[in-house]
Amino acid sequence: MGNFFNNGQRMPNIFERARAYEDGNKGYVQQQKPKTNIVVNTNRIGYGKKSTVSEFTAIAYDGTGNKIDSIKGYFLEPETNYNKAKVRNSDTSIEQGNYNVISKTELEKRINTERRKRGEEDIQLTYKWYVDSVPGRSGIAIHTGNYGKDTKGCFLPGENYSYDNATGTYNVWNSKKKTKELFDFFDNYGHNGIKINVNSK
């Protein structure tokens, strides 16, 4: 005979209890984020009077370090002058190096925690993704744009680029499309962190 509760209802057997546990935890399992991370490798390949162009490859890795996906494109930055790269508001490309890319939400939380300690009001950032802890600089973001005047140190993604002989400047094109592709890539695979390595050829 089976086991019964005091109210006369039959107690579920071990298989029924296991199934109920599994069903009850489906939402939890589905909400767990995959252990994937991203490395963005950039190489500066063109130096203009008012802008710098680099090629990038963003690579996604699984939890064991295996490459699972990648995308390519170009970044536009302002003019490169390494003597001013660490100078605040210098309107130049940042110094070469390895950085973390963090979300607007994460950076806002950190900034506003410090501001509250000083009795200051919270701020709201503009862009979705930021290059973190750049020496001497702040607010270095990844966002749309086509021309050198559109960036004060930020990275502007593009599908392709061109060089204007008359002005000596580089431009990137189809920026909105490439930015969306890159941000979708970040959202899909950047759960365990995003790094960007800024280099020159």
Annotate the PLM regions.
Residues M1-V39:
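Low-complexity, glycine/serine/proline-rich disordered segments
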Residues G27-N171, K177-I194, S200-K201:
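Cell wall/extracellular polymer interaction/catalysis modules
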